[in-house]
Amino acid sequence: MEEIKNILIDFCKVNFKTDCDWYHWEINEDVLPKGIELPKGKNVNKNVSLKEQLHSKWSQSDIKIKGELIEYYIVQWGGIKSNNKETLTFYKTKPAEELINLGVKGVSSWSKALVLHDSNKYAIFDSRVSCSLNYLQIINESNNKILFPILPSRNNKISSANKYLKQISKNWVKLKNDKFYELYLSLLNETAKDLNTNISMIEMLLFAKATELIDKV
């Protein structure tokens, strides 16, 4: 994990020198949960603030409001509308340990739920984040490549990149289904500590740069 950590640190250093205009995920401020007010300015700052405020509100709310906040973050903010009612209820009500034990299944959704549990401890893991972590190792010609789970995507470029990854990664180290998320968090935390930043900034950078990294291979 040391090699990918050093690659990620260098990648972050280059991009954090800019004004962070690389993050373009816009928030529909017309459907924000009650009591949430976002700062003016860049999307990256708005999204960090949203995570922090949602976590604060979640931690002080009853189970009904907790569930509503998680559903907002998965469905409205995240745009994931494919979960059935039963699955969404599971994500809304179960503790972190049970969600993490799901492994790859539904990780793009349940990792969003975990951000509300604690935005400083947990981070989103989705197809773009995974793709960036894998492609950074290709670009930097890593000697000991670690395959982060390849997740389905609605984005054509990500889907094509995933097909290529499956072809070339047969000899990569495969992360166990019940361990990859904790290793991912460990990687983010060690990187964040070295850079004196937070794990949200690193996750958002990985999300934002996925298609750009694909184009470099």
Residue ranges with predicted function:
Residues M1-D30, D126-S132, L136-V217:
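C-terminal accessory module of base-excision DNA glycosylases/AP lyases that mediates lesion recognition
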Residues E2-L99:
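Long, highly charged, low-complexity intrinsically disordered interaction regions
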Residues G67-Y72, S111, S127, S200, ...:
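Non-catalytic, well-ordered alpha-helical scaffold segments
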Residues I74-S82, A113-N120, L133-L136, T191, ...:
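Generic structural signal for hydrophobic core residues of well-folded globular domains
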Residues K94-D118:
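Helix-hairpin-helix
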Residues A123:
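Short Cys/His-based metal-binding microdomains
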